[in-house]
Amino acid sequence: MMEMPIDNLWSQVLERLQIELSRPTFETWIKTANAERLENNCLVIITPNPFARNWLQKYYISTIANVVQSILGHPVEIYITVAKGEEFEEIGGGGEWELPTTNIINETPNQNRQPNTELNAKYVFSRFVVGANNRMAHAASLAVAESPGREFNPLFLCGGVGLGKTHLMQAIGHYRWEICPNSKIFYVSTEQFTNDLITAIRNDSMQSFREHYRAADVLLVDDIQFIEGKEYTQEEFFHTFNTLHEAGKQVVIASDRPPNQIPSLQERLCSRFSMGLIADIQAPDLETRMAILQKKSEYEKIRLPRDVIEYIATNFTSNIRELEGALTRALAYISIWGLPMTVANLAPVLVTPMEKIEATPEAILTVIADNFDISIEDLKSNSRRREISWARQIGMYLMRQHTDLSFPRIGEEFGGKDHTTVLYSCDKIAQLVESDRGLSQTLRQLSDRIKMNSRSRKP
């Protein structure tokens, strides 16, 4: 059977991908690629540079393969390469950084991995950046990996989205496989556990379900907060937990909140979850965020100027996913436009307004007064002392950023100041922050404290 002409095939692939993918994704990554040839059941796709090749390999090769299969009626192998003369080109022109010339997606997975268990090859201890925000969680995870079923059982990792809970859990799994290749390591989300349970009930195979999970040497359960309201799932998990714990097997659980804050969680489960160690993970501080970016750039074989690292770390503070996403966005932007890796070139693509949060004026006033070692009364006064006036201007700026209050209402919160005073203060700080990196860092730190202050006040 003759294969379809390559131009015709690629034209159809583009038509379907244009519908399936978002416009920015299609324009940036798919439209710039081209199909070179189709032979021996292998489609060769050419990309303009190594970064584009790696990006397609990492995120879109499966999508492309599925579309090609739907057109040809049979599966084909997809091989993505770089146009001749581009393989070793430094993108950016300034020689300030390099892109990897090796394909990062071809990491060899652990050959001892159970077929029902999926661990990310990048989630290992050596790639985890330790800081004040996660030191205890890291130490506890390493201790569990070295001696499972002993001191911290269960280990309950608690923290917000994108802070490294899943990384630590899977690092435990990888470590155990290195030490004991025949270990039965089960990593499962709470949703998957529930789905497996439903399937077992439907197929009348509850015994197999129980034997499967209770055979684990290490059970890693992610997002346990989603067990909320699932009474039968809680019942089965309780007995699975008991069986493993009594047998000296290790259980590691991750959640975005402590056990006692998971609604409708059975009291006996809450008690079991709390009987080991609850290790909290907070948002990383500036130094840790910079270290994370540095380590990621080293693994990707990219040289980043220190001021770029500091700029990204200062402006993206919520979690690690946001931080790494900003770096990825920066690399894509620089690659596409062929620009040097500088703060000035990255500023347009990394613009991120400060997060609007449900902060009360009182919470903001409290943080500002505490930071500048003055009183709230000083902030509301008519004092023109330099330190008080400066603190007041920053407070007005942050209140504008973190609330929906109008300029007149903000003026009222600061002791009845005129709205023109508030407008002047906000404009002044906004202009200064564009060139004053120290001020930008101060504002981010104050914003982080305001967020924590506001969350702690929620019922």
UniProtKB/Swiss-Prot annotation:
The keyword Cytoplasm applies. Residues 335-459 are annotated as: Domain IV, binds dsDNA. Residues 118-334 are annotated as: Domain III, AAA+ region. SMART domains: AAA, Bac_DnaA_C. It is found in: Cytoplasm. Keywords: ATP-binding, Cytoplasm, DNA replication, DNA-binding, Lipid-binding, Nucleotide-binding. It holds the Pfam family Bac_DnaA_C. SUPFAM superfamilies: P-loop containing nucleoside triphosphate hydrolases, TrpR-like. Oligomerizes as a right-handed, spiral filament on DNA at oriC. This is Chromosomal replication initiator protein DnaA. The gene is dnaA.
